[in-house]
Amino acid sequence: MKKVLITGGSGGIGVGLVRAFCQNGDKVVFTYHKNLEAAKALSAETGATALCADLGDSEQVSLTVRSAAETLGGIDVLVHAAGIACVKLFDMTTDADWDALLRANLSSAFYACREVSKIMLGQHGGRMILIGSMWGKVGASCEVAYSATKAGVRGMTQALAKELGPSGITVNCIEPGVIDTPMNACFDADTKRELAEQTPVGRLGTPEDVAALAIFLASDAASFITGQCVGVDGGFAI
């Protein structure tokens, strides 16, 4: 049984992650920001512990990680799934949009990894799994700011893997494609159908697709895998 902290646990992919790790027999704490009712429901369903936090605030992250470690008795696995999207033409993207994306997608990952690393270094081991995006690899029109933040997550994954590897800590990034979650509710049925047709396997992804890889990367079988950015995109970003 692993002690797992999942950020952004009340969101689409996050819900799938919480369910999967709980079904795997692991002890789970997850964070949420504003969706209290969803967090309560997920906690009741899975038995996982929910903690409210604004992960763009470094002080809140420090307190949250400390609380999670106390609840779990340490942290073996961090899965950082918190984040937001923004679909806009580049010249219409505001400073506020940019700042919000940086805060939610990149700063939050930096803060979470930094605080959890302090615990894992003391334990002489651990697994960090960051949820990026295929757009961090290939870029997306009308999602320039989002793509840039996810490219930052990609770079941080690789740098952290080099620094933390000698201490027994692996760091990997999962890069989902178009996943059928509330984050992509901005797409109408026709757009979703077109995206599915553009995906070689012929469908959109599910949170369960992402969670399956996270479970593997957290397992003992993945101990020699680090610094990797693995696509779960149905072949979209080939």
What annotation goes with each model-predicted range?
Residues S10-G12:
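Conserved glycine-rich cofactor-binding loop
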Residues N24-K40:
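Conserved glycine-rich Rossmann-like NAD(P)H-binding loop of the short-chain dehydrogenase/reductase
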Residues L89-F90, T94-L102, N184, T191, ...:
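Substrate-binding pocket helix/loop in short-chain dehydrogenase/reductase
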Residues F110, G125, R203-V232, A237:
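C-terminal substrate-recognition "lid" of short-chain dehydrogenase/reductases
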Residues C113, T149, T157:
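Active-site helix of classical SDR
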Residues K118, K162-P166, S223:
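Alpha-helical segment proximal to the catalytic Tyr-Lys
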Residues S133:
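Residue(s) in the substrate-gating loop at a strand-loop-helix junction
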